[in-house]
Amino acid sequence: MSDFDDSLLDDQEALTRVDAPLRALAGTGARIRMDAAELVRPDLGPGYRPRGVVIVGPESRLVRALLEPCCPVPVVAWPFAGLPAWTGPLDLVVVLAGSVGAGPDEVSSSAEAVRRGAAVIVAAPADSQVARAADSSSTVRIRTRSEDALGSAVAAVSILHELGLCPPVRPGDVAERADMVAEESSPFHDLSDNPAKDLALALADAMPLAWGDSVLAARAARRVAEALRRASGRPALAAVSAELLPVIEGAPAHDPFADPDDGPARLRPVLVIFDDGERSPAGDEQRDRLVAAAELHDVRVCAVLADDGGALDRYVTLRQKGLYGAAYLELGLSGRRT
């Protein structure tokens, strides 16, 4: 018997159970605009070009993924306290933090960057500990006001574009993508006209296998898999195709004569492809292998699509669509705990 009650997805009283996460998701665009409201043109000297870029804090790997394909200098996402031993006055350190400031690692990295004489871009509230630690004559300050690490990352990337380190990123456009997903995923749209609710229904009795067809799509897949695990308390795997194929190939055969009311539902894998429109021969080959294996082993395939806008626009679209799906999955499963 399925634990998922799809009638809850269109029940206005039941929807109050996930009011907090839905409101948080709906406010993503507003938070991005808020954190980008006070952006200033960086003044690090004419023709400034760092030897390398070190990124620390939440969403550092997202910023690295955006920079790596086109940045003319090496880029490192540093997950520890302090900084790499080679960091010095010729380098740029980017520190990301939310409105609650940052953890001790980010504060340590900020202070170390100043001590070594590196240029610093810090995205943090003006009165936070990390902003104070990063204070120097060569610090570019982005005064953020929300708790959303994504907003800090978007603001920082727009500054990095001004320095010629990445393609154009317009925070307003990114925010608009988040707003568009919020509109189409609104709880006031019923299941027949709501892709996020439809995704939740597809994953009702499933073990999601999330795969992205590009670096950023794969990152969105990992973020969504994390949310699905929290929402359902079930396994959800985001991995490269070589790691997903054995799971698909080992899926138990589907029994069309099984009684759905006879015992608990058996979780079967569902392949969820996050497609941001980036195409490469290697990515196309991996996709074809995954889909072929899924068809052979009677594994359902779902697609989350974003094929319009810049790289960060598409990433945010994929991420938001998946996170809305996770929220509705949590709602559909909430009956088992009531």
Regions found by a protein language model. Give the residues of each.
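Active-site phosphate/pyrophosphate-binding segments
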Residues: 12, 17-20, 24, 30-45, ...
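Phosphate-moiety recognition in structured ligand-binding domains
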Residues: 1-40, 68, 118-126, 130-138, ...
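Glycine-rich, anion-gripping cofactor-binding loops and their flanking helix/strand elements
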Residues: 85, 93-108, 248-281
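Short helix-loop-beta junction
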Residues: 64-76, 226-237, 293-298
